[in-house]
């Protein structure tokens, strides 16, 4: 079983990756998802894939997601910023990182992986 963190799960590459994961639940498990701005889609993805962690860009988005998650039974932890992206990219449980953040924004996290 491959344990995956997706850096940029709300973009086209991230969404395509999740489509493949959904087709092969016996081969893949989602450890973490992340986004920059699209917290509504990230929340929907969290409900569907139940990751251990989600990451967004800042404290405001983090609080918004934490508030939305209170109404669920999920134990997903919400992180934010560079430290959050680096954490999910380099966690020991992760076997595969999908670096789907465009440009230099995802460079440090990709190097951490």
Predicted segments, located by residue:
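Short glycine-/acidic-enriched loop or helix-start segments at secondary-structure transitions
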Residues: 16-17, 42, 65-66, 107-110
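Glycine-rich nucleotide/cofactor/substrate-binding loop typically near the N-terminus or early
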Residues: 31-83, 89
């Amino acid at each position: 079983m491959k344990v995956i963190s997706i850096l940029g799960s709300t973009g086209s590459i991230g969404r395509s990756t999740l489509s493949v994961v959904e087709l092969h639940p016996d081969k893949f498990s989602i450890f973490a998802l992340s986004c920059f701005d699209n917290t509504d889609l990230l929340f929907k993805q969290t409900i569907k894939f139940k990751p251990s962690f989600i990451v967004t860009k800042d404290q405001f988005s983090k609080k918004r997601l934490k508030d939305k998650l209170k109404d669920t039974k999920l134990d997903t932890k919400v992180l934010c910023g560079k430290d959050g992206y680096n954490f999910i990219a380099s966690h020991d449980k992760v076997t595969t990182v999908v670096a789907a953040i465009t440009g230099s924004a995802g460079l440090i996290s990709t190097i951490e992986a």
